[in-house]
């Protein structure tokens, strides 16, 4: 797999389209940071890091994401878009961090201070690589 972040986003997109309650994704620290941001922003209910047997453990292999839906079953995540790819990296300076849908969505950046949303990066005054947009 050449782009594990795109794989994570595709699994989330497909799971939401299929109205699943959870989705299992191969784990990494970057993916866990992205899941933390999605939880903090209210796009998912939560996530757990699991070993191969499905139990919480030290050698993490799987990231289990619990999806969130509205009171009538409507999607909370309506769109996910990968921005920076391995073949074409996209960076923004601290003054150029983009808004997603005029502030209705969230951009996720990796910066020198860690993974954060576009709003947090603009507030702190750092730029970075834009991983994805979600709305």
Residue ranges and their predicted role:
Residues 1-135:
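Core subunits and conserved enzymes of cellular information-processing
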């Amino acid at each position: 797999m050449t782009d594990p972040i795109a794989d994570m986003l595709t699994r989330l997109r497909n799971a939401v389209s299929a109205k699943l309650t959870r989705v299992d994704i191969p784990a990494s620290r970057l993916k866990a940071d992205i899941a933390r941001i999605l939880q903090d922003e209210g796009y998912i209910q939560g996530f757990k890091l699991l070993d191969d047997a499905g139990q919480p453990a030290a050698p993490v292999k799987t990231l289990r994401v619990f999806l969130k839906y509205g009171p009538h079953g409507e999607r909370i995540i309506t769109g996910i878009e990968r921005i920076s790819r391995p073949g074409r990296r996209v960076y923004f300076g601290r003054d150029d961090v983009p808004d997603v849908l005029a502030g209705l969505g969230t951009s996720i950046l990796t910066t020198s201070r860690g993974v954060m949303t576009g709003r947090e990066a603009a507030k702190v005054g750092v730029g970075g690589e834009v991983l994805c947009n979600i709305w």
